[in-house]
Amino acid sequence: MMFRSKKVAGIALAVASVTALAACSSSGSGSGGGNNNNGGSSSVVKVPGGIGSIPMAAAGAKKKAGTITWAMAPGATPNWILPVIPSANNSVYNAFNFIDQSWRPLYWTVNGVVPEVVNNMSLAAQPVYSDGNKTLTIKMNSSYKWSNGKPLTANDLLFTIDFIKAAIKASPANWAGYTPKHFPDNLVSATAPDASTLVLKLNGAVNPTWFTEDILSSVNPMPSADWAKSSASGSVLPAAQWTPANMAGVFKYLTAQAKSVSTYTTNPLWQIVDGPYKLSQYNTTTGAFTMVPNTTYGGPHVTPMSNFQAVAFTSDAAEFNAVKSKSIDVGFIPSANIPQLPQVLRLGYNYFGEPDFGMNFLNYNFKDTTNHFNSIINQTYFRQAMAHVEDQQGWISAFMHGAGAPAYGPIPAYPKSPFLPSNAATNPYPFSVSSAVSLLKAHGWTVNAGGTDVCQSAGSGASQCGAGIPAGTQLKFNLIYNSGSQLITSEMTDLVSKAKQAGINITLQSSNFNYMISNYLDPYAPANENKWAMQDFGGETNSTYPTTFSLFNTGGSNQIGDYSDPKADQLINASITSSDPAAVRSEAQYLTASQPSMFEPNNDYTWAWKTSIGSTMPEAWENLTQYYTTPEYWYLNG
């Protein structure tokens, strides 16, 4: 699970424009990512629910290498290089757009707009589970090796697991994928009987889909034959010496190197990769970077490969100016510029947009004691009242220009999911200020529309404000938002206005994405837990199995506001230990009713690329809508 800004996810197409531009494409279907389908009967790929189209590569098309430029999201530039990512750096921008280019995850889990494991982009065959799903055997993919010629082995995976253990021992915040009592705490043993095989024995049964696609996909093997040392001049430790004490030294050394951003391009550690690219340039001020092909890359890719240059921008407007001036090869289309999509086409770009698999949300802080907010937000009726003042359809129409889909719980209504619960198919708390007012009045609040509501009837009775809320408490608190996103800014401004009509007095405070995920995400930022009541930095990207494990379970590694509910914990635990597909649906149904966050509509994430840029498979463009960047498939037309 990775956090993301919604800054460029606020990309939409006016309904009128959909009709006008539909003539530019013909219908078809995706070929299924990793399959390297280079042609078909249709000249374009048209994905249901998406906007725009993706031209298919012409048979026999000439391909040449050069440098292809790609636009980064303003304010969300990469700032971490080590494949084991701390919570403070846990974003799709560090993981999918930067680190994964050089160090591939064990399992690649996005196939264009289809959430599934892509076998030939994964470093191992899918695990074989046995012993009641308590043992799994992993066979490494022999196609992959390190850029210095050394083989990629099971020992590299074992080394990475031992490194993660050392990181967690120093601080649970050192690995964003960690939740106490779960991986790697639940490992009874990890052994490598031969160079290509790793056997993991767990202390309890797991859901195989979840463990493969949520947990193991978060593990990027690291080169043990070169990185298993505690200093630049130190000897590389053999596997027999990967003791906790020795691994503590390795962790300290590699982490110190990762913090030295000024040496990213000169440190020889970062040149040993198994992914398609090596870092060649990195701007410590802007985060812009350039990567060159790893000529020994064993995964699927175009031949020849081009350099990949990530360009930094200070604002959406600056980025779109680059599109208009044709100075960027692959760029996003900000929501404010959607009416100009016909112009973008005339400039010589293709475009495609689709919602991603994750969720957009406004987070509540269940630990903020300021003005008794922790007690207020702990009341389910109040969270439901907040849902009633969220105008999802209005946001889709006004801010997404019609190209968005509502989401009423952790599993959005679109893209379609077989796990969608019945209570999330339609809005259980439709926009209605009067409904919010009725809920507040029914629970002991004196409503002052346009002003600030006051708790009149203190207590924990059915018609009272709730436990821990004294009489005279005002409904008054702050909301910190990612002001780099015009979409978030518009949504939060509208939310504050609608809430005010119900006497809920919210003060907006602006911030930026990187600062927010580093300073306001509990449980690893406790010093700031009384500095925010609500926050909206964007959202998160789900795996193919949409459990909210680590996000909404008590003590979860990606907990943002410390929501804790024994019933939710029970259902989430069932989702990750049972093979019953109904388990995760039951989890989502409960959370849709409980509203641990304010769930927001999903909007299309739209990208444009020059017609002079091709791809050997359409999924490489679809991947962008899911925050994954796969430039190893892109090429310059010859």
Model-derived regions: residue spans:
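Surface-exposed binding/hinge segments that line
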Residues: G177-L254
